[in-house]
Amino acid sequence: HLSIRRQRQMCIRDRYNTLCEYTFTESSQQMDYSYRTLFAGALEDAKQVLEKTTNPADRFATTILRAYAFQIMVDNTSDSPYSEALQGNANATPKWDTGETVYKGILGEIDAAEAALDGSGMDVPDLIFNKNIAQWKGFANALRLRMYLRFIDANIDAASYTEKVKTLVQNNEFFTGDVKLDCFLDETDKRNPWYNTNAVGLTGNHCAAYPLISYLSSTGDPLSLIH
């Protein structure tokens, strides 16, 4: 039993053993967690905002968040529903577009939304940048940079995207500080829900698993001392 448990977290902690052992099945929550969270949550919310508002600044910020969600999805699954996504029961089995198609699509969305800005401010509450459009533009540029680098790494129009990277870096118009929902406090019932559940309620389960520790130790990685 000890040899089995050594492959896991610790003898007294077993919440994430399925992750350590890669014992996933088709019914495992982890298999489609990103898909369900992003499409049923974030992307559906963004769709509703875009359908209801005509304010260019609100649409710009929402488009950036929509692009960010799709970018994460592509990084997780390579291909992703995009051109036929978010139609609900009208199309319950949307086509999965290539990551290249999705990236180019959302880059175009960002460009169009930014071009539509007319100097007006945001109407909706903004818990990320406090309605600072310059910061939203900086976030958009950071997303562009990330996707350009992905294209270069995949050798897709590498020369063209290399020039785009050089231009972004030279202009240096990125956000400052952090991109975060700045509305939580370290007080009961006021913490980030994820933090409240995992960092406060399940602290003991947050320990490095045996496969990680054994690898770090065998390679002499100083991170083993931290973990």
Which ranges hold each PLM region?
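Single conserved hydrophobic/aromatic residue that forms the stacking wall/gate
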Residues: 1-8, 12, 226-227
